[in-house]
Each structure stands twice: as C-alpha cells, then as structure tokens.
Amino acid sequence: MAASGRGLSRALHSTPCPAWKRVQSGANGCLKPEYDAVVIGAGHNGLVAAAYLQRLGVNTAVFERRHVIGGAAVTEEIIPGFKFSRASYLLSLLRPQIYTDLELKKHGLKLHLRNPYSFTPMLEEGTLSKPPRSLLLGTDVAENQKQISQFSRKDAQAFPRYEEFMKRLVLAIDPLLDAAPVDIAALQHGSLLQRLRALSTLRPLLKAGRTLGAQLPQYYEVLTAPISKVLDQWFESEPLKATLATDAVIGAMTSPHTPGSGYVLLHHVMGSLEGMQGAWSYVQGGMGALSDAIASSATAHGASIFTEKTVAKVQVNSEGRVQGVVLQGGEEVRSRVVLSCASPQVTFLELTPQEWLPGAFVKRISQLDTQSPVTKINVAVDRLPNFQAAPNAPGDQPQAHHQCSIHLNCEDTLLLHQAFEDAKGGLPSQRPMIELCIPSSLDPTLAPTGCHVVSLFTQYTPYTLAGGKVWDEQKKNTYADKVFDCIEAYAPGFKRSVLGRDILTPQDLERIFGLPGGNIFHGAMSLDQLYFARPVPQHSDYRCPVQGLYLCGSGAHPGGGVMGAAGRNAAHIVFRDLKNM
C-alpha cells in the first residue's frame, strides 16, 4: 500500500548526515589493501567489535553489503516522511559497559525511557458505561498491584515477589553475558598455561551459583520448564500470565507450553538502561540512530566503515590461516584476522572455503534451528489508535498507554498456544499474537505532525506455508489484513487511519537483513543452542576451526537481541590472540 492522504503535505526535512559518515569521508574513507582486522557486516555487534578493536589499536575495516549500516538495528524511511525502526524496534539489552566505554551519549545516542511499559487491553464488553478492562504495568509497585487486582487480588500480592525472584536470577546470569563460556577443552586437554587461563573462565559460572545459593533448583526449573508451568505456580489470572508469557515466546517458534521457554522470558527482562533494571526505551531517531552512534564512536578512533561492499569469500592461505577477504567486485583485502557478524550459516556455509572446515562442524552448522514465527509490519497512520479499553483524550495527544508495548490477542495463554499450533500446521495464526508499539508517541521526529509510526511485531507465521507454498504479495497482504482486523476489534477506526504499510515475512527478514530463516536471534535461543553450545559445542569462544576467523554476531554467545555483548566479547578474544601471534 503506497503512502498517501492526510498529514503528508508537510515538506520533508532532509536527514542530517550521521557523524560517522562525515568522518568516513576523510582519510579513513578510502579502501586500503590491508588492515589488521576486517569485520563482515555492519550489524550492531560488528560495529561494537570494530569500535573496541580500534580503541585497542587494531586498525579495523567493516564491510556492509547494504546501503545502510545497523543490520536489523536500522532506521529506514520506507514511506515518505515516516522513519521506521524497520526490524529491531526497542532497546533494553545493550550492555551498560558498551554504553559507557564507547561514549554513545557523546556520539549522539538519545533514549526515551518508557514508563509504563506494558498495556494489555481486554476484548470484552464494558459494564455500567465503563470501558473494557486493561492491564497497565510500569515501575510503580503500588500502581501495578492496583492494575492486577482488577483480575486477582492474590496475584496483585504475589507480583512484587515474582519480580524480586526474577531479578535475582538476572543478577546471577548477568556476569555470564560478558565473557566467553567456560573453556572445557582447555581445562581437559590444554597445556598447564592454557589450563590456568581457562580457570578464569569458571569465575562467572561460580559467581552465578553463589548468587542463586539454595534456590538453585527453583531457578533451574525457570530455565528448563515451560513458562506456563512457572507462571501457574505464581499466578491465577490469565491476562497477567499471558502478558508475561509474551516475553517467553517473542521471536521464538515456541508456545508458552514448550519446555525451556522460560529462558527466552529471562533474556527479555535482563536489560538495564541508565541504571534502571528491566527498562525498555525507544531510541531518538529510530534504532538506526544507535547504530550511527556506535559507528561514530568507531570512526572517531580511526575505524573504516564501507557500505555497499559485499564480502564474497573469506581468504585462507595454504596453511589454513585467514589472510583476508574477497569483495564481490573481486577486490582482495588482506588482514590478520576476520570477524563475521553474519549468521553462522552464511559465515561457514557460504563465505568460508569448505575444505578448511571439519565435516562434523559443517553438519552441525547446517542443522541449527533457525525457525522463525515473526512477521513484522511497519505502518504509517494519520492518527493515534483509539482503544476501547482506554479511549483517546481530546486533541488526540499520546497518553501513557500509547508509549507501551501493547499486547493484543493476549488475554489468555491458550490464545498464544492456539496461535502457535496454527503455524506448526503451516498456516498463519488465525488470531496472531500482536505486539503493537508507537515510538512516535515519545519521539515526534519519526513522523509528520499529527501522524504516527506503528510497529507490529506479529506471531506466528511459518517460513514455508502448508503444501510448500511460498509467501507472495497476495498472501502477505491477506495476513496483514487479518492483523489489521484484529487491531480494529480493540481500536475501531485503525484501518481507516492507515496511510501505508511494509510487510516483512520470515523470508523477507532473511533476504533483507540476513536473518537465517527470518530468525531475529540468528538461531533459536533454546537451551541446546546457548552458552557452551552457541553456535555449536566446542566453538562457543568466538574462535572458529579456521585460525584467525571469529564469529561476533548474534549466532555467538550470548545470543540475540540488541545487546552488543557478542561483539564486545569477540573483540577482546581477538585482541588477546593478536598479542600472542
């Protein structure tokens, strides 16, 4: 649907040139034949790795195949006048050290913290001239309890205890995110020096155990059990359980009844922004502004970033060691090391010469679970959605609930499970799980005056439809129409407000952003693909079977989300190895 109609008459402002591009046009903007390090892909992890390496004195170049940096953390003006965080759309998980070390605030990063942060309207008839109920959650404990007590007084009393329980688990796991997993191979078979070094990798794990103490069995259950079982032990009201369960299935082809879904919930509550645990924010200017800030930090110290430069091949010498990359145009760029921010599948099955990779390793990479349930729909509207459960104020000004993640079709965990079952049968969900966000409610720079950008993160849509059918434009639009019908039931008039939309199925997410299977994490965040086993067992320390080749994207430990930890951790491993070469 093309953008048209009201609100688009305002002259469009030209987007200012990001600071990293202004620096890039200088001396470090020319492609050199050799660098110390080459990074494949300017996703946020690749940019973080480059920024750290350059600060450590490692001359680094980043090659990005698209015209824009950021990978999935990108801002694109798909519809004239409307700037969309086209894939990733919220910030919380970015490691605090990265925010500080790279001086991202100095390099232009501005955040809009959300409080309240979650809104779940009910699809029910109002009573006695009152609107339908809704659940609004934020950082105010008393207000949360008041909201929850609409559905269960018992749950209102339990909720603060639940949050404290989860915070302790987050505190335990937090140190594991900022270091490579325990080096089991070195502990078992390494030299004395290697074993001594490997002992240090045990510290975060031991610290986690001490933090959990006698409650370790209960926390183990959170990580391994279905999240529905965990939530049933705490609560009785379905709206609260379903709202919390969305964090356990977001981006995952799993149901709340799937064992291990608890970790994905934990993954989405372990963030911290500006000292606020669990806070989520919109980035001023969209998620691409975060990538621009990281790039600015990198180029300010001398890193080179090139767009529309596709790496076609990792070069390996006759001794089995990396010696650089070959670009799509045939240009050879030599380097001592190569870091890949691309997915494990692209890195090892497409870019790396297969003769240098063990067959067992290639087989494991090819068998990684990359199922994705996600279709992302970016929408331009000429007015705010008007929810029956929380009618708009006169003047159509954003209210507290408009800044939240708005959960639709989430009144009951059974709805989430049924939506999952549809997709397992090869069909788009009849009642999709919808997370609706309106970043322009806090950041008016994203849309023309009076208009808004709406992000719809929807599940569940299979990569391949029943009968082996693929997503064509008709099927995409039919699904989007179904999503809009669902929103219309909660917010009548929504469909009339739509000026344009951008529909990204799992196949689109793979094609445009390089997300394997459309999986936003570069691979499932299931326990069999985490920590020791990410991307595969014995290769969780960012190093690869080819000497000098490293994985630094979301397919490496600790996984997906706009976290930057994989890029930071890999950079430190690379720097240590360079010193020992």
UniProtKB/Swiss-Prot annotation:
Its EC number is 1.-.-.-. FAD binds at residues 38-71. Transmembrane segments: none annotated. Its main location: mitochondrion. It holds the Pfam family Amino_oxidase. Interacts with COX5B; this interaction may contribute to localize PYROXD2 to the inner face of the inner mitochondrial membrane. Belongs to the carotenoid/retinoid oxidoreductase family. This is Pyridine nucleotide-disulfide oxidoreductase domain-containing protein 2. It comes from Rattus norvegicus. The lineage of its organism: Eukaryota, Metazoa, Chordata, Craniata, Vertebrata.
